[in-house]
A protein has these predicted regions:
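Conserved alpha-helix/loop element of class I SAM-dependent methyltransferases that forms part
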Residues: 30-47, 64
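Class I SAM-dependent methyltransferase SAM/SAH-binding core
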Residues: 52-105
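Conserved beta-strand signature within the Rossmann-like core of class I S-adenosyl-L-methionine
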Residues: 143-150
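A short SAM/SAH-binding and catalytic strip from SAM-dependent methyltransferases
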Residues: 115-127
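C-terminal alpha-helical "lid/dimerization" subdomain adjacent to the S-adenosyl-L-methionine
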Residues: 8, 24, 64, 78, ...
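A short glycine-rich, Lys/Arg-flanked "PGG" loop and its adjoining helix->strand segment in the class I
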Residues: 129-141
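N-terminal, positively charged/glycine-rich alpha-helical extensions of SAM-dependent methyltransferases
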Residues: 1-20
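A short acidic, Gly/Pro-enriched loop at the edge of an enzyme's catalytic core
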Residues: 104-116
C-alpha cells in the first residue's frame, strides 16, 4: 500500500494548497484536528524525549507536543515539501531543526528517536511497507510511533456516515474554507 505512482501528483497538490492547508483541515475535521493531536500525544511523550515529526507539514504535531511537555523535548521536523517546513515561524518561538525528505528514505541513524509523530501524513507515503520499516529503524527500542489520521470506522453505520461526509459534505466545507483551491483537496482525500 501507499500512494505509489500517485505520490508526485499528491505532492504537487499539497504544494499548491499550502496557503489554505491548515484552515481547510481544521474546517473539514469540524475543528477537531487539534483535539485529536492532543489526545494522541498526551501521556505518550516524556520530558527530554527526542522527537521526529515525520510528514510534519508546518509542525502542528510538534507544536502540540511542545505545549504538552512545556517545551522540554527536542524536535526535528521532517517533510518532503520544503515550503511547508520553511513556514514554521508562525508556530514556534524558536526555529526547530528541519530536514527535507520522504518516509521511505529517512536520513537518520538507527534508534535515534524516542518517538515519531505522524499527523495526517502517513497516508501520503509512497510505500507504506518501506515507511513503516524506516520509522521502526530510527525509533529507540522502547520508542513510540504516534499516528493521527483518518480511518474507516468498524461500525457499518458510522462508516456509512463518514463516507457520506467525505464524499458529499467535505467538498462543500473545503470550498467554504479554501475557495477555488478546494477542488485540489479531492486528490488528497
Amino acid at each position: 500500500m501507499g500512494l505509489g505512482s500517485y505520490w508526485g501528483e499528491v505532492i504537487d497538490v499539497l504544494q499548491e494548497i499550502i496557503p489554505v492547508y491548515d484552515k481547510v483541515n481544521s474546517y473539514i475535521s469540524l475543528g477537531k484536528d487539534s483535539e485529536h493531536r492532543k489526545r494522541a500525544i498526551k501521556g505518550r511523550i516524556k520530558n527530554g524525549d527526542k522527537i521526529l515529526d515525520a510528514g510534519s507539514g508546518f509542525g502542528n504535531m510538534s507544536k502540540t507536543a511542545l505545549d504538552i511537555t512545556n517545551g522540554s523535548i527536542s524536535i526535528m521536523l521532517y517533510d518532503p515539501l520544503l515550503p511547508m517546513i520553511k513556514n514554521t515561524d508562525r508556530l514556534f518561538e524558536e526555529k526547530p531543526e528541519v530536514a527535507c525528505g520522504v518516509f521511505e528514505h529517512v536520513p537518520f541513524k538507527d534508534e535515534q528517536f524516542d518517538a515519531v509523530l505522524s499527523g495526517y501524513s502517513l497516508r501520503d507515503a509512497i510505500s507504506l511497507k518501506i515507511a513503516i520499516s524506516e520509522m521502526h529503524r530510527i525509533l529507540k527500542k522502547d520508542g513510540k510511533w504516534i499516528i493521527v489520521d483518518l480511518g474507516k470506522p468498524d461500525n457499518l453505520i458510522t462508516r456509512f456516515g463518514v463516507s457520506f461526509y467525505l464524499k458529499m459534505i467535505l467538498p462543500i466545507v473545503a470550498y467554504a474554507a479554501g475557495g477555488k483551491l478546494w477542488l485540489k483537496f479531492a486528490t488528497i482525500y
